[in-house]
């Protein structure tokens, strides 16, 4: 989330100038930068998905990041809109398997963005630095910033 904002100064300014946008921005960036990109499940019954039969007791990988950018579910799915009003993303899973810590994580993200942007409204990744993002768990090992 901080890496994305460091690369998008207009969004940084929005959050610094209008902190009321932060809760929506958190949800949108969770949709876009889904922290856990996939989960493994076992089917409980025979089913079919998009014409593909899946037998009971099959192991399937659910790609949450893909679901969160599905154009059938999202208007302008391939763009980030921190003003997006309806945002029922799957960044924390869903149903009985939903992350128990999702409410705490959201609160932590809101507080971090509020406090950071109140103190450091402008920041960026230094020129020439390439960010190394882990593909399975959306994380960056090192995020150098200048402000």
Where are these regions (language model features)?
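Cytochrome P450
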Residues: 1-147
